């Protein structure tokens, strides 16, 4: 129960939203955290030919963006849409946010027919694992679900990018993320899926004093969450740019 309370506090959205997107600090990270080997050739072709691009982001509470206080503006899928349109002017880009709070990997898969397949996206970004770890879902069950979900996406010929768990010192002190992180990395390597290492990225930010919820007054935490989402979106745009580049 304490794990879920800590996770809930991390994602809390009980404060008023800021009037405009707050400026994010310099949140660059080492290339090895962002870059991965798999490529996204279909997305690359769409961007090069300026064909319409639809990206579905399916995930949990952090995808929904509740902690920012204004999910419609500040959630990272919304900020990703802005970042990609700036990088690829003239390309019609739509990013659809399909985040639902407190769902396991299997519960997200159950939404695939409605929230992914029916939308025929160019790219699927799948953020998962945080709630599985918080609920201590058996790692073998988590592994089987993730493998099954990726197989379904592959059957529908959908390019996919995985996003691993969130990191904060408070959650890491009560939740053992490591088996889930290792499982995601292994499955991504075996399946040739691009893994966006959000956990390692957020840990880098925390260790380098870029973001720290513990040191910020409660009334400023929605602003900080919005900054984190902006940085995630910017780094995701970096990852996509890397993944569409021919080696």
Stretches found by the model and what they are:
Residues 7-14:
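Bacterial N-terminal signal peptides
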């Amino acid at each position: 129960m304490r794990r879920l309370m800590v996770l809930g506090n991390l994602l809390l959205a009980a404060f008023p939203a800021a009037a405009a997107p707050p400026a994010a600090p310099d949140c660059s990270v080492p290339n090895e955290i962002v870059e991965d080997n798999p490529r996204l050739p279909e997305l690359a072709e769409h961007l090069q030919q300026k064909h319409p691009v639809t990206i579905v982001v399916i995930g949990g509470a952090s995808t929904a963006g509740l902690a920012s206080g204004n999910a419609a503006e500040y959630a990272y899928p919304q900020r990703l849409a802005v970042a990609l349109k700036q990088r690829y002017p003239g390309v019609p880009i739509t990013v659809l946010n399909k985040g639902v709070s407190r769902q396991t990997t299997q519960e997200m898969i159950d939404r695939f027919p409605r929230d992914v397949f029916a939308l025929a996206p160019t790219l699927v970004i799948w953020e998962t694992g945080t709630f599985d770890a918080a609920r201590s879902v058996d790692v073998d069950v988590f592994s089987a679900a993730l493998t099954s979900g990726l197989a379904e996406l592959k059957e529908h010929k959908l390019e996919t990018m995985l996003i691993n768990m969130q990191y904060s010192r408070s959650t890491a002190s009560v939740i053992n993320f490591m088996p889930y992180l290792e499982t995601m990395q292994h499955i991504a390597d075996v399946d040739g899926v691009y893994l966006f290492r959000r956990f390692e990225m957020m840990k880098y930010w925390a260790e380098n004093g870029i973001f720290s919820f513990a040191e910020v007054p409660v009334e400023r935490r929605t602003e900080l969450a919005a900054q984190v989402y902006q940085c995630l979106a910017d780094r995701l745009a970096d990852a996509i740019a890397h993944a569409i580049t021919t080696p």
